[in-house]
Amino acid sequence: MAKPIPRIGSQRNRRINSRKNARKMPKGVIYVQAGFNNTIVTVTDVRGRVVSWASAGTCGFKGAKRGTPFAAQTAAGNAIRKVVDQGMQRAEVMIKGPGLGRDAALRAIRRSGILLSFVRDVTPMPHNGCRPPKKRRV
């Protein structure tokens, strides 16, 4: 016999969700993935478990506006606002990708009040691997 599906607002579900939100985390890692079309900001604890994330698309930007620096700044602000409420004070920043949102996201992270222990560029660089896509002719 299948288990009954718990009600949405049940006591058990409320207890689980409150435990997840109550987790204090003084240190974390912020990953910024800046592509030409979108910027994704992921915040994890030191063990690598995702605590919060945001992208320019989830912040309401559509189409070509997702690749703009302002969209990256908004996404970084939204992702960090959640973890500052949980008590994050120090963070390491890993930036990946060639997009326009790299600097804007880093600026938003610095402005949030979190102390940055280091900022590392982890953009993958080929040692002459795959052939790149052809250049655009406009």
UniProtKB/Swiss-Prot annotation:
Biased composition (Basic residues): 12-22
Keyword Transmembrane: no
Source organism, top-level taxon: Eukaryota
GO-annotated cellular components: chloroplast; ribonucleoprotein complex; ribosome
Entry-linked Pfam families: Ribosomal_S11
Family annotation (PROSITE patterns): RIBOSOMAL_S11
GO MF annotation: an example: structural constituent of ribosome
Subcellular location: Plastid, Chloroplast
Renumbered residue ranges of the record's region Disordered: 1-22
Keywords assigned: Chloroplast, Plastid, Ribonucleoprotein, Ribosomal protein, RNA-binding, rRNA-binding
The keyword RNA-binding appears for this protein: yes
Gene Ontology biological process terms from the UniProt entry: translation
Record InterPro entries: Ribosomal_uS11 (IPR001971), Ribosomal_uS11_bac-type (IPR019981), Ribosomal_uS11_CS (IPR018102), Ribosomal_uS11_sf (IPR036967)
Sequence similarity: Belongs to the universal ribosomal protein uS11 family.
PANTHER family: 40S RIBOSOMAL PROTEIN S14/30S RIBOSOMAL PROTEIN S11
Subunit structure as annotated in this protein's UniProt entry: Part of the 30S ribosomal subunit.
Protein's recorded name: Small ribosomal subunit protein uS11c
Lineage: Eukaryota, Viridiplantae, Streptophyta, Embryophyta, Tracheophyta
